[in-house]
Structure formats: C-alpha cells, structure tokens
Amino acid sequence: MTPNEFFSIKYHILAKAELKAYIDKLADYLSQQSYLYHTLDKPIISDSDYDKLFRLLQDLVNDNPQFKPINSVLDRVGGEVLAGFETIKHKKKMTSLANVFSLEELRDFYDKIEYDIELECEPKMDGLAISIFYKNGKFDYAVTRGDGIQGEKVSENVKTIRNVPLKLNTSNPPEELEVRGEIILDKQSFLSLNEYMQTHENKTFANPRNAAAGSIRMLDSKVVAKRPLKLYSYGIGYFSKDFVYPETQFELMQLLQSFGFTISDNMFLAKNFSEVEEYHHKMSHQRADLAYDIDGLVFKVNNIKLQDTIGYTARGPKWAIAYKFPAEEVESEVLNVEFQVGRTGAITPVARLKPVAVGGVIVSNATLHNINEIKRKDIRVGDRVIVRRAGDVIPEVVKSLPQYRKSDAQIVEMPTNCPVCDSKIENVNDQAIYRCTGGWHCQAQTTERLKHFVSRKAMDIDKLGAKLIEQLVAANLIKYPADIYKLNFEQLTGLERMAAKSSQNVLDSITKSKEPSLARFIFAIGIKDIGEVSSDALANHFGSLESFRDAKFEELIEINYIGEIIANNIVSFWHDSLNIKIVEEFLAIGIKIQNPVKVEHAYNESFTGKTVVITGSFENYGRTELTQLLKSIGAKVTSSVSKKTDMVICGDNAGSKLTKAQELGVEVILEDNLKDLL
C-alpha cells in the first residue's frame, strides 16, 4: 500500500476485526519504512508522509488500546543493524523523542508538566545519532543508534572525525562515560563532497544526512578521514557512579563542552513559555542561514531532578520533546525539462515546475542531476513529483509519483546537440555526464568560464560579479579572459545600471588582480577537474608557468592530488592551440604571475631525507606544527607506516601505527627524545 491508500481508508467505520487488521498493516508498513530509512538509508516515502502515518497509528492505538501491536514502531527506535560491523548492545537504551508539529502542541507539552519550569532549547541536527564510550577519560568505542538496543561498532571511523575528543579534557575523568551526539556534514562541505563524488565516482549523495550516515558506515576509515564530518554532542547515556552529574541540563552541556565536545552555538535557556516562543520564532527564521541542516528544535526540562520525577515512556523521555519543522518536501508538476550548459560543458537537466512553496521559497526550477538519474527515477514531463530543497539550498526532484501519471507524459531524452551553440554533445567513457564540445565557441560555457576566472579563489576581481559578466558577454565586450583587462571606462558606463563610480571600482579591481600567484592563475584558467588544492600542488611542484606548460604525463601523476584523469586533462589543455593563445594574451597585456618562493630546507642529520610518520597526540607540539617543522628540515612526512618508513614519532594514544612500526622494526622516537634530535 501507499501512504495515500492508507489515508483514503475510512477507518472510523470499520468493524473491530477490520480495524485491528488495518492497525497491524499500518504498523508493519511503518516498520518497513523505518528499516529503509534508519538502516539502509534508502527511504521510499517522504518524511512528511511518515510523520503523518505515525501520528495516525498513535491516534488509532490511543483510541483502541486493545489493538496495540506488539513490538511496533510505537515501542522502539530505528531499524535492524547492518551486517559488516560488529554489533554491540548499548549499556543504556538509545531512545528517541516524541514529536510535535505546532506551537499549540508544544504548549500542551509545557502545561502537562505542571511545574513552573525552565526549558533548555537547542536545534535538532539532521544527521546520524552516535554514542561514544569513554573509559577513564579515553576513547574506547563508538556505536550507532541501530535499533536502540544494539548498534554498529564504528569506532575507527568515528575516531577520524576531527572534533571528536580522543581523550577527555579533564584531570579527573569518570571511570565510564557514554557521550551521545549527532554526526553531521555541513551544507558547504556537502556540496564540495558531491562535486568530488560526481567527478571521481560518477554518483552523489541525496542530502547531508545520507552523506554523513554513508560515510560512517564505510569499511575504509581512510576514506572517512577525508570527509569533513563533525560531531555535535547533545547529552550522555550510561555513566559510572563516580561521575558527578550536574544539577541542570544546561550545566551538563557546558560540562561536555569543557571536556572538549562541540555543542550547538544556538542553545538557549528559556525561563518561561514566552521565551520558548521567541526561540522558536528566531530559529525558524535563521534556519536557512545556518551552516548545517536542522529538521526541528528540541526542548528539555532543565532541572535534572525534575527530569527523573517526570520519567520515561517505552519510546523515550517524557521530559523532552522534538518540534519538527513543516515538511521541506512538497508535490508539484513537471511542466518541461530544459538542459543547461556549465563551465566545463557539462549538460545538466533542469525541471521547470508548476510554482510551489518549499521551505518559505517559491520554487519553479529544480535540478534533475543527470540523464541517468532521470531514468532511474522515471521522471517524465507532465508527471507529479516530490520536490525538496536539498540542503535547504538547491531544489531537486526527489521522485515521480507514477500512480498519477497522465497518458501523454513525455519521456525525457538527452539532446544530441547543445541547446546554446548547437555543437555536438558527447558522452565520454559512458559516464553519466554529457558535455557540449563547443568550448569557448559556446556562449554558455564562455560565460561560466569567465565567472570562474574572476572568482575569489581565482583572480579575485571582486567588483566584477556574475551579473556584470553576463552583461559584458551579451554585449560582445568580452569573450576570452584577457578581454577583461582591455575594458575601458566608456564601455562600462555604457552598460545598464553602471554609473561612473561603479565603473571605476570595476577597473580598479581589475588592475589590482594583475599580479596573481601561480596557484591562483592555474586555478583561474579552468583546466577540467583542477581545484584549489591541485593548483597549489602544481604551482609548488613546477615553480613557474613555463615549467607547468611543458609538463609531461609521467611527471604529473607523481604529484600529490594529481591522478591519471587530471594529468590527462592538463596534457590535453596544453595541446589545444586556443588555450595556448589565451594564456599568451595574458602575458602580452602585462599580467605578472608571481612564482612560489622555493623554501630551502635546513639540514638536520636525524631527519633530512628521511620518511617520517607522526602518530598520537603531543604535549609540546600541534600535529600540523610538527609536520611543518619536519618538512622545513627536509623530512618527508607520510600518513601510513610501511617498509619504506625510516622512523615513527610517537605521542600519547599512538594506536595501530606504533604497533605496525614495532612489527616492521621501524625506529620509534618518543616526544621526550624529539627535542634533542630537532
């Protein structure tokens, strides 16, 4: 059955036997959806529909308690544990909070407590719930929520998260302490990760929550370590008798922060319900501007003794409640599908939608990612679809609703020619991305390439914005990057909304950009798949534009961050006569590229020319500081121990790298001896 079919049944007129069967079927359906969402991270219904069905089941069981299903979603949290990780039983059950969906319901929760209370208020992070166990102040293991009773042991992955303390910041740690929190990926990191995934693996994550959950469930912790996950702590689970529990929830959060955990910047202590309403109003309006996704707000009774008095249900605490924001997923209709052309020629399908409000914004366009996604989701022109603002930023079509499909719905096909310049569209190596072959002859690519060229991390021409670039291209005043440096005052003031002062500011900004670093210039010229990090690596390796132009494939693939695909892109770039002409025009008009300064390494008998691995934490050095220090005296610092490793510098909590060094007979240097050697 579908959600709509459940809603369409007139359950209030069913006979008792039929009603019981309906309740059982609804409970089974929700259990299956919970499994798909919590365990497999592959939901097939919207959050809004799940919440409505859950409330329907609650209402039916409240009215007919004799029909309450055994072991249903009303009694437990999440789903079953995936195979592939060791399962561990939680020392204290990981419950979840009851939900409310309006201020009126939130007021009811407040009034039922029957005390004059303070509420600790915080955002409800949309990530992966985790429980981290500490023994005598040191990280022991980490477990996912799982089904609330037991979860997956993901210790090695969690330890890679930079803001997870491996040692509690206290001289008197409790014997045992279980800290709970949410692992998230912020919006900007999610977008960057998806760009990388699209380029290197031809797939993307649907949203930041799926990206965080998928990362933590990876078997290779080295891959996880490259993803900028963060932990936000929200409380504790099990604790030993020697733990001195604070008197309030707010003080507990401050204590966790003092231990080294990150807590939300948006926590607030409300002294009455009026302040609760103010907090709700503030966070509802600030939600879109937060760096991370939240799907609601959490309100907890602040007094710990009062929490104990109020108690728990089988599902979770009665002293806390989650207010869930209105659904960010709504239905709309696909009016048409158009194809946009990006900087590298990538053709992206965009759905033109019947305008609909999503998260306070009127959405009429949504990305369809690529033609493979359209086919996988079976999206057609004329379909009713679910629309979501992914990451609260980019509207996307989540899925079609084929049960409402019209007979004249049109299948979407990839065009054979560019919709802008009519050049041929190619699909290289059978990847999901199709590209226009027009290059600089395609106005869409030209415009996007020029926007990239002037961007902050490239040439940083800050007064030359995207809209002005579009105006200049449309007026045929610029076509190639060097044309920007030929613009004059009269040309700029002749454009719409360009007064004398604005025009002069643009010219000053252009002049200021004429001495870029080599790394900025490499990034600015827009070689496919070359990002900021790759540009730095190339600039530092070659030292000059001339050397970079003469780069050979065999040399390129030996450089950090440069694989075979990027190396091929670089070689192809310099084999294109138009690219060479564009770069030569820069030099002809007086662009002075600043080559990186070569740092001469000081000689050190112990470290120069040696391959070194750093492990553990140090009292007198930060890891980054120590790495830079070793490099400055000629050492090669690597991340893993092998037969080629000359020495391992070992701090506290060294772990497996120390063990491997000892097995291989690699020299181990402790911090106490390090200062003498340096």
UniProtKB/Swiss-Prot annotation:
Enzyme Commission no: 6.5.1.2
Residues that hold NAD(+) according to the record: 47-51, 96-97, 122, 145, 182, 300, 324
Active site, UniProt feature: 124 (n6-amp-lysine intermediate)
Gene Ontology terms: cellular component: cytosol
Disulphide bridges, residue numbers: none
Chain residues that bind Zn(2+): 418, 421, 436, 442
First-tier enzyme category under EC: ligase
Keyword entries, A-Z: DNA damage, DNA repair, DNA replication, Ligase, Magnesium, Manganese, Metal-binding, NAD, Zinc
Record domain BRCT: where: 602-678
Lineage: superkingdom: Bacteria
GO MF annotations, alphabetized: DNA binding; DNA ligase (NAD+) activity; metal ion binding
Cofactor(s) annotated in UniProt: Mg(2+); Mn(2+)
Family annotation (Pfam families): BRCT, DNA_ligase_aden, DNA_ligase_OB, DNA_ligase_ZBD, HHH_2, Nlig-Ia
Gene Ontology BP annotations: DNA repair; DNA replication
Catalytic activity: NAD(+) + (deoxyribonucleotide)n-3'-hydroxyl + 5'-phospho-(deoxyribonucleotide)m = (deoxyribonucleotide)n+m + AMP + beta-nicotinamide D-nucleotide
Function statement: DNA ligase that catalyzes the formation of phosphodiester linkages between 5'-phosphoryl and 3'-hydroxyl groups in double-stranded DNA using NAD as a coenzyme and as the energy source for the reaction. It is essential for DNA replication and repair of damaged DNA.
Homology family: Belongs to the NAD-dependent DNA ligase family. LigA subfamily.
Record-given protein name: DNA ligase
Species name: Francisella tularensis subsp. holarctica (strain LVS)
Lineage: Bacteria, Pseudomonadati, Pseudomonadota, Gammaproteobacteria, Thiotrichales
Gene expressing this chain: ligA
